[in-house]
Regions:
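Non-catalytic terminal accessory segments
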Residues: 1-134
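A short C-terminal boundary segment appended to hydrolase-like catalytic domains
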Residues: 16, 47, 302-303, 355
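Extended active-site neighborhood of metal-dependent phosphoesterases/phosphodiesterases
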Residues: 128-130, 135, 139-145, 149, ...
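Membrane-embedded segments
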Residues: 134-137, 148-235
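Active-site metal-binding loops of divalent metal-dependent hydrolases
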Residues: 161-164, 193-195, 227-228, 252, ...
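Short, glycine/charged-enriched secondary-structure capping and boundary segments
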Residues: 172-175, 203-207, 236-239, 277, ...
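His/acidic metal-ligating clusters that form di-metal
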Residues: 180-188, 213-220, 244-325, 332-333, ...
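Conserved small/polar residues in nucleotide/adenosyl-binding loops
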Residues: 352-361
Length: 363
């Protein structure tokens, strides 16, 4: 319900504004304005139809509806940003006129030109975004870890975060992620939260757990909760994650081998999750300690407890500009490498790769 409320607020705030400005820009002809009106009516109707009947509709139908509505939702954000820039330009003209005379004399043509520039620009941006999502790449970062790891002088980890398996991210893309992971020949794979998006049925019905079982890592596959694991069908998500072949770490401490510790924290959204201090009782702090924590809020806590490396996801680096700028105001480190005292952190947007040594790490 929370997701729906957020989406419908955006629908009811952005769509009327876009419609109003677009309608003004179009020529006063039925052949232009009627299709424009129908587009907005159909999109909003499709959105409500998909939400109301989401549990009754076949998966392929609801997936199609989500593709259409999600694409328009993202496009509407960029259209709105473009229109707001134009509003500022119009305001500056009112304060101190500076538009050339030819523009004033052809104001309707100018608005129509800007209309098509925004449409084509946002369309190109959406095509680029789709290509980026559907063609994931591996991010490699080098990190130095000071502690010795016994007889082990190398450890390769693949970290995947924020898969958001659901209506949009499905079986084909997960198979790409698995193939990318196996191509790195990792010692260990970690799935750092938000494995599912909202409903669990899409992962269940497509048997995506069978694809995740194909992840190859001699030290195992480890999974932690993200905030999306607490949205809708929580128990079903827990049962499904247990079928993936990985080890689910919910406030748990394991030693994949005797040379280092791996601590998987429950998500920050669960206010009753255990403190890191309590989880580390009995942990030999002379060995490397790696903590998986979906949301990057606990840097100070990790630093105080002697953690060597914190691995996080969640932020998507804002994902859509200008959100990355806002993320920098919200998080101490919204993306990439960060060091606080002796503790090092990496916040991933999707796919990351680590190789640890006595004196170094490759992430």
């Amino acid at each position: 319900m929370k997701v729906f409320i957020q989406s419908i607020v955006a629908q009811l705030l952005l769509n009327p504004y876009i419609f109003w400005r677009g309608y003004q820009a179009l020529p006063p002809k039925k052949s232009c304005r009627i299709p424009f009106i129908l587009f907005f009516v159909l999109e909003l109707s499709l959105y409500f139809f998909g939400f109301i009947f989401r549990n009754e509709l076949p998966d392929n139908v609801i997936i199609t509806i989500q593709y259409i509505c999600n694409t328009w939702y993202i496009a509407s954000i960029y259209i709105t940003l473009s229109l707001l820039v134009l509003e500022l330009i119009r305001l500056s003209q009112r304060i101190k006129p500076w538009f050339p005379k030819w523009m004033k004399g052809h104001w309707q043509q100018t608005k129509l030109t800007l209309f098509f520039l925004i449409v084509f620009g946002v369309t190109g941006l959406m095509i680029h975004a789709y290509h980026t999502v559907m063609n994931p790449i591996v991010k490699n970062v080098y990190i130095t870890l000071p502690k010795a790891a016994g007889d082990r002088d190398s450890l390769t980890i693949v970290m995947m975060s924020d898969l958001h398996i659901g209506e949009v991210i499905g079986k084909d893309l997960v198979q790409k992620y698995v193939a990318l992971s196996n191509a790195q020949h990792p010692d260990m794979v970690v799935l750092a939260g938000d494995i599912m998006d909202y409903e669990s049925r899409f992962a269940e019905n497509a048997h995506i757990e069978d694809d995740l079982k194909q992840l190859k890592a001699p030290l195992g596959v480890y999974i932690i909760y993200g905030n999306h694991e607490y949205r809708a069908n929580r128990n079903a998500k827990y049962r499904w994650l247990q079928k993936t072949g990985g080890t689910l770490l919910i406030d748990s401490v394991v030693q994949p081998d005797s040379t280092f510790y791996l601590i998987g924290r429950d998500d920050f959204i669960h206010k009753k999750r255990k403190s890191l201090h309590s989880l580390m009782e009995g942990v030999d702090t002379g060995k490397p300690i790696i903590v998986l924590d979906h949301q990057p809020w606990s840097f100070a806590e990790m630093n105080m407890n002697g953690v060597d490396l914190g691995l996080h996801g969640h932020t998507h680096n804002g994902q859509l500009w200008p959100y990355p700028l806002l993320m920098k105001l919200v998080y101490e480190c919204p993306y990439g490498y960060y060091k606080k005292g002796p503790t090092q952190f990496y916040v991933s947007v999707s796919y990351t790769h680590l190789r640890a040594h006595e004196t170094g790490a490759y992430l």
